[in-house]
Amino acid sequence: MIYVTGDTHANWDIGKLSSRRFKEQKEMSKDDYLIVCGDFGLVWDGSAREMYWQDWLTSRNFTTLWIDGNHENFDILYEFPLTDKFGGKVREIAPDIYHLDRGQVLTIDGKKIFVMGGAKSHDREYRIEHISWWEQEMPSNQEMERAIEALDKNQWEVDYVLTHCAPRSVQSTLSDWYENDPLVSFLERVRKDLKFKHWYFGHYHLDKKINDKFTVLYNKVIQI
């Protein structure tokens, strides 16, 4: 089985994965998956606190998967080598914790899932490069091209889509405050052409079912 949730921000919002709040995990095993839709935050500085929470996740009755958001330390993340899993590329961060690389269609628990991490930080002017902000938060042209190639190979049909930010038209329904950028425009193109059952995303610190096709997640943990 697969569950998805929103940003964990290291240990700040990880409490939603406790057995008290996420009771379904008692019936799960390491063959089941919990996927975080970006801003995982537990590959940041290698501190003792970070290692504690990685160990805590490893001890859960599920395997943790995550896509990157805009608040990740990409310098450290990209030091982890890519390895083959789910028919694509992942980074093994710790036992039973895997980062899902951008722009892939993966087969997880028999479901075809398109994953595309990344988002634009709208408070960049208050952040410091390589300390609290990384240029790699936004996918490169190469990563977007890889995503298109992956979708081409799958005839533009998947079961689910997991991203950190939303397509432009969906984002605009959440708030007028959010600006257009190359990634939300790219995702808008994908939205128009892709056949999918449902699209889940994080980033906006909100739990809301937008419509029959889109759900934004933050604290909720839901099964797909």
PLM region descriptions:
Residues 1-18, 120-131:
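Short, charged N-terminal beta->alpha structural module
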Residues 88, 95, 109-177:
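Active-site-proximal loop/helix segment associated with metal-binding centers of metalloenzymes
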Residues 1-3, 104-115, 160, 211-215:
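Beta-strand-turn-beta hairpins that frame and shape the catalytic cleft
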Residues 4, 33-37, 160-164, 200:
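Structural motif
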Residues 63-67, 89-95, 166-224:
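Conserved beta-sheet core of the metallophosphoesterase superfamily
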Residues 5, 11-108, 176, 183-187, ...:
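Core catalytic region of metal-dependent phosphoesterases/phosphodiesterases
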Residues 9-11, 40-41, 70-73, 119-120, ...:
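Catalytic metal-binding/acid-base residues of hydrolase active sites
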